[in-house]
Amino acid sequence: MSIKSDRWIRKMAEEHGMIEPFEAGQVRFNDAGERLVSYGTSSYGYDVRCAPEFKVFTNVHSVIVDPKNFDEKSFIDIIGDECIIPPNSFALARTMEYFRIPRDVLTICLGKSTYARCGIIVNVTPLEPEWEGHVTLEFSNTTNLPARIYAGEGVAQMLFFQSDADDVCETSYKDRGGKYQGQRGVTLPRT
């Protein structure tokens, strides 16, 4: 398996719809010239943006967090250009980008250092071969202060690893009917 470069990422996005919408270069400023947390194609990855829809965890209803029987009342929905995450809490969001991962590719997501250096950690499981959808992002605020997340700006980087031609997986995410296949919007746990 080898990591793929900006040339490969551009080709796969432009010719095969791997990432939509797609930004061929790095965007660091908005139209008004104000600095952004960068997004778009980098040397060996793609920096994704957060969409303006969030689910912020709340304990108002005092429900038990159970991944097999998750209660939607555990979240407050927020739509907007930013989201405030309470201290020592978390929020779910999604990428603006929709992904279509090829059968011979595994994609790993890492949080951007701009957020990590503020105590905001991004967690995403790998995007498996032939998975497609919006990526659900989990932001953990590890600080004892409120933390701000910006929609429309970079939040995480996707790294693409392509298998050797003789070592493509036998069973893809699509083949096994993965429960998050084709997800749109912020997706809560499923069993």
UniProtKB/Swiss-Prot annotation:
Residues engaged in binding dCTP: 112-117, 136-138, 157, 173, 183
Keyword Protein biosynthesis belongs to the record: no
Catalytic EC class: hydrolase
Gene Ontology molecular function, alphabetical: dCTP deaminase activity; nucleotide binding
Reactions listed under catalytic activity: dCTP + H2O + H(+) = dUTP + NH4(+)
Active site: 138
One GO BP annotation of this record: nucleobase-containing small molecule interconversion
Record-listed E.C. numbers: 3.5.4.13
Pfam families according to UniProt: DCD
Keyword tags: Hydrolase, Nucleotide metabolism, Nucleotide-binding
Domain of life: Bacteria
Alphabetized InterPro entries for the sequence: dCTP_deaminase, dUTPase-like_sf, dUTPase_trimeric
Involved pathway(s): Pyrimidine metabolism; dUMP biosynthesis; dUMP from dCTP (dUTP route): step 1/2
Residue ranges crossing the lipid bilayer per the database entry: none
Assembly mode: Homotrimer.
UniProt record similarity statement: Belongs to the dCTP deaminase family.
Entries under NCBIfam families matching the protein: dCTP_deam
General function of this protein: Catalyzes the deamination of dCTP to dUTP.
Protein name: dCTP deaminase
